[in-house]
Curated annotation (Swiss-Prot):
Modified residues (Phosphoserine): 1015, 1017, 1019, 1037, 1172
PANTHER family: GUANINE NUCLEOTIDE EXCHANGE FACTOR SUBUNIT RIC1 (PTHR22746:SF10), RAB6A-GEF COMPLEX PARTNER PROTEIN 1 (PTHR22746)
Comp. bias regions, Polar residues: 437-448, 1379-1397
GO terms for MF: guanyl-nucleotide exchange factor activity; small GTPase binding
Superkingdom, natural source: Eukaryota
Sequence ranges of the WD repeats: 64-103, 304-343
Tissue: Present in kidney and various cell lines (at protein level). Widely expressed at low level.
Assembly notes: Forms a complex with RGP1; the interaction enhances RAB6A GTPase activity. Interacts (via central domain) with RGP1. Interacts with RAB6A; the interaction is direct with a preference for RAB6A-GDP. Interacts (via C-terminus domain) with RAB33B; the interaction is direct with a preference for RAB33B-GTP. Interacts with GJA1.
Name the record gives this protein: Guanine nucleotide exchange factor subunit RIC1
Biological process according to GO: cranial skeletal system development; intracellular protein transport; negative regulation of protein catabolic process; positive regulation of GTPase activity; regulation of extracellular matrix constituent secretion; retrograde transport, endosome to Golgi
GO cellular component: a single term: Ric1-Rgp1 guanyl-nucleotide exchange factor complex
Organism annotation: Homo sapiens
Keyword entries, A-Z: Cytoplasm, Disease variant, Guanine-nucleotide releasing factor, Intellectual disability, Membrane, Phosphoprotein, Repeat, WD repeat
Amino acid sequence: MYFLSGWPKRLLCPLGSPAEAPFHVQSDPQRAFFAVLAAARLSIWYSRPSVLIVTYKEPAKSSTQFGSYKQAEWRPDSTMIAVSTANGYILFFHITSTRGDKYLYEPVYPKGSPQMKGTPHFKEEQCAPALNLEMRKILDLQAPIMSLQSVLEDLLVATSDGLLHLIHWEGMTNGRKAINLCTVPFSVDLQSSRVGSFLGFTDVHIRDMEYCATLDGFAVVFNDGKVGFITPVSSRFTAEQLHGVWPQDVVDGTCVAVNNKYRLMAFGCVSGSVQVYTIDNSTGAMLLSHKLELTAKQYPDIWNKTGAVKLMRWSPDNSVVIVTWEYGGLSLWSVFGAQLICTLGGDFAYRSDGTKKDPLKINSMSWGAEGYHLWVISGFGSQNTEIESDLRSVVKQPSILLFQFIKSVLTVNPCMSNQEQVLLQGEDRLYLNCGEASQTQNPRSSSTHSEHKPSREKSPFADGGLESQGLSTLLGHRHWHVVQISSTYLESNWPIRFSAIDKLGQNIAVVGKFGFAHYSLLTKKWKLFGNITQEQNMIVTGGLAWWNDFMVLACYNINDRQEELRVYLRTSNLDNAFAHVTKAQAETLLLSVFQDMVIVFRADCSICLYSIERKSDGPNTTAGIQVLQEVSMSRYIPHPFLVVSVTLTSVSTENGITLKMPQQARGAESIMLNLAGQLIMMQRDRSGPQIREKDSNPNNQRKLLPFCPPVVLAQSVENVWTTCRANKQKRHLLEALWLSCGGAGMKVWLPLFPRDHRKPHSFLSQRIMLPFHINIYPLAVLFEDALVLGAVNDTLLYDSLYTRNNAREQLEVLFPFCVVERTSQIYLHHILRQLLVRNLGEQALLLAQSCATLPYFPHVLELMLHEVLEEEATSREPIPDPLLPTVAKFITEFPLFLQTVVHCARKTEYALWNYLFAAVGNPKDLFEECLMAQDLDTAASYLIILQNMEVPAVSRQHATLLFNTALEQGKWDLCRHMIRFLKAIGSGESETPPSTPTAQEPSSSGGFEFFRNRSISLSQSAENVPASKFSLQKTLSMPSGPSGKRWSKDSDCAENMYIDMMLWRHARRLLEDVRLKDLGCFAAQLGFELISWLCKERTRAARVDNFVIALKRLHKDFLWPLPIIPASSISSPFKNGKYRTVGEQLLKSQSADPFLNLEMDAGISNIQRSQSWLSNIGPTHHEIDTASSHGPQMQDAFLSPLSNKGDECSIGSATDLTESSSMVDGDWTMVDENFSTLSLTQSELEHISMELASKGPHKSQVQLRYLLHIFMEAGCLDWCIVIGLILRESSIINQILVITQSSEVDGEMLQNIKTGLHAVDRWASTDCPGYKPFLNIIKPQLQKLSEITEEQVQPDAFQPITMGKTPEQTSPRAEESRGSSSHGSIPQGEVGSSNMVSRKEEDTAQAEEEEPFQDGTYDCSVS
């Protein structure tokens, strides 16, 4: 509603003695001038600019006679000021203008500037006037004056002798006697006033009073703390004609403030609270409306230590009240008690170092024009002694503080047509929450407030029409789009009175003192009247509204002295020539637009409906307005000023289903009128015969139905929101009426629809009013999105930038910098809960189902469950009819039931879990439901619940179920958590945090995170688990870390063995199902020690039973195409090996993705080593390796010049380190030289492309080579054969042949390989001839293999070359300790030369070993 902005400003008064410091400020009725009182001084200040104009100083002699000045009161026309003094005198000062055309301050413009001296009202608006103060009259009332109050043309004065004086402004009593309060009868209401009691004691007098014009009486506070309301029975103001009413329960009143618009009397009390009363229309009694008080919950340390209420002031628009206390502090409240600001907490009360500040004490305050400023005279009071010396220097030059505010448009223009956007207006700028919209429409334009612009989002204007703007637009960020109001318009029309935004959020119009101006968010331009005389000739009286591209406003024409209704087109020039003008009979107070109708409320208490339509006659487009209907409201409205808002709505007590013509349901069904906080509805009277208009004559459409007598819908209403949009899916929300009720929160008048369009019961209500509390002040409602938008003050401390003794910067130390932030809140859970409380579960279900697509709907259900649980489970008394079972049953209707319950439980303390699960069901059953629904993450959350509520055995049992399911589904993160969880259960701990990674040199990790070293094969103790990143400096196959004590003291830990058994079982199942890809992911993600396990399972699970099935499954899993025979292969020179070396190197170069050489040094020593290693491998051992995944793109690379050997980049294939086919820079010499003499024919290129096409994706190739290496190290030669067949590389077969020749290999395995290859050969002959060429190539190796098999090597004799013991006797990580001279995957003939192999190549291969299966996506990337 109202929000503080920035720091307060300080206005310095003339230097004088501390005794002359100001203590009272009072604005004139127009709030253009301020009277400031000191003990013997009266000063007049101007509001804009805020400057001192004139000061009257009382001579010392007369000052002694009169006593010090106390209070000041302005005459309604601002020509006189009455000042009361301590000795009972009233001094009347006349304010006169200095003769001539002189001003105190004038703006100086350069020559040729557009501000012309001939502008109407130029001097009056731009210059501070020169005034004189002259004391004209002195009146002695012979008793201390307690209160002054201006009443119409008289001055009402209350004195301490218990008298009320009615004095004429010329200083005469007109012969009227003073009224003695003891003669005024008081009672609890007006009906019993004649027999009322008198005050009954002699020293009674009025301490404070204020006149209420709309109640025609005085709210008074007596010196004994009682409060009351005195009203004259007739127009005569005599003791006989006065009587009073008072509430019995207020005995500690201190001050009073009256709100004329809402007819409220706010009484400040000694307790620090404010009691707000209204008058009962029927009995005249004073009824308590609400209280304004700080709560212990919000302000635990200060709520009852504020002292008495000292001052209260309602804002000029009567929408907020500001309250101060005796011990300091300031708070701001809305009309019906919503707290907006309080300076007793947060950054206002505490410094940045945590020490407490003394609250600001306020001696006097007064609102400035339109509520943009609050003038405050502060008494710093008992400040800290360390800064008292600085404050003395401040007191020497007394000052006035100006607090700056920005406010919601709803305070002054509540009938704004766009109700889904928040628009705030400040003194010279506007804040709105749709800033991102314009950027996408016109990207070239840039805002001067670029810091308030969010990132570009989809334009909400794209769909056009009246559709709801997207959430991204209205909620996208916390910043505002700030529009600076045109300075040209402000100079002569300050202050801004009204503003409005159109339905699409593209255009804003503002109204100042005269005329109006509008701004486009798309073009970033203001449009002002070209003829300034036309602007200065109109005063907008009743606000303004947008209708499509038109601005509709009610104004007063000064020249013609005529009330008018005008319509201006946005796109045309701002000129009366393009306006449509309709004359009005009386002054328009409020204006609103609904669909194609304009509704106005006039000062004669009548409502007039107009139709508005677009007219395109001739070159100029205009809008035509015609009167449709007039409704007199004078019977129901005691004073026109009491009407806060008037709107046409489509809301009625009957739903569209029950109307005889459902299509009329969204038409103008009723008038909503906010009368002093009382919401009144007048519906169309459909009881008469003219319900249906059968003929479609346009004239008949003008015959509108009359309105029924008004019905009161709600009390204490501040704002109303409704929409005429229709949406069949969300009828509940769009046909509802939303009310803001201040401290009572919000209310919604919700329609109730029968299910499945059945006929409603006649005895059931078709609408229901549901109250609910929200934590923000609502400023807009997003109807479809079930959201309330608002704003909230935030503060920033800058006191640390200044030293304590720096008195000049004291304001920045005393006050935080205030900013306004956007906020929003979901309200759907409140409504659902209210419906369930009222046994309207069916309606709640319909409403919830219509909102189930909202992104925060799960949060809505969770909030509802959580709030009901907290309330009922913590209640001290038994609840006869608990709501929790109903809510639980309601939530089960939605698929998110399981998540909602567990999320609620996880956010609730453990003590409430039993109460929750007694209502929603046993957590074990819910866990099993999650497993059946394959919702493993939710099941994991239930596991934590079970761990706390059940014995460890039950937790372990359920954890095992979940772990096995997670393994099957490849949820690796969950698997890791489950392993930790299971281990924690076994060790009796509630939770075991993950081990902290040790520091590792980053030079060789290449940015990859490898999990293998985490060793989640948990038979070892936690302290032995190395958790570092994978060290590429170690040997390829085995990770680093002190894991040699694998079967050490913890080997009997049943929990670790239990987990290991599950991991082994899963690995065995994967291998038996030939799911090698899943096995690789499993090993890489969970750090499963695959090699050591395969060594043990070599003759069991790791044995290939059916080579053909394995081959087919690998082709399918790795997306590897079956080979085909190219048509040209018969004549291809490649087949005969003519260009085998060059072609092989070319193709192999394409398979060598440079990223795999993570940081392979291309230094000379490494090149030499690599060349020496490769020199031992003759080119004849290589076959064509076409392992490229890049397809046709790579063919271009064949034909482009290859990089020279001087390049720093290594292009060798890291994937082939397990064989002897790697290449480094040295080999490109041969390729480069041979390539220049080589000319490939078309058929040869076709052959190359065919070979490329028969390879699978690059990722698959990397993964297959990783697995090949693993199986080679583990000695699973049959799997190596299968992978070699898929890759179609005879070098792999050669390696296996070398291994079988050089070591004692299991004869059964060799026999299995031989049988398997024969089966593959048969299968290739019948089903897959594409394999035949490769099988023919490796025939010699197969024959050698047959010879070896016949030798029948003993099965147990096989050991990997590097292992001295069987795997059972060594640590699974023992491979790390092997020397570089032995490598299980290097053929025997190359073992000797492998000493020279760069260790970096092994590191690269190790990186490759771990990388392919890391994140389930198998993406390879270098960081």
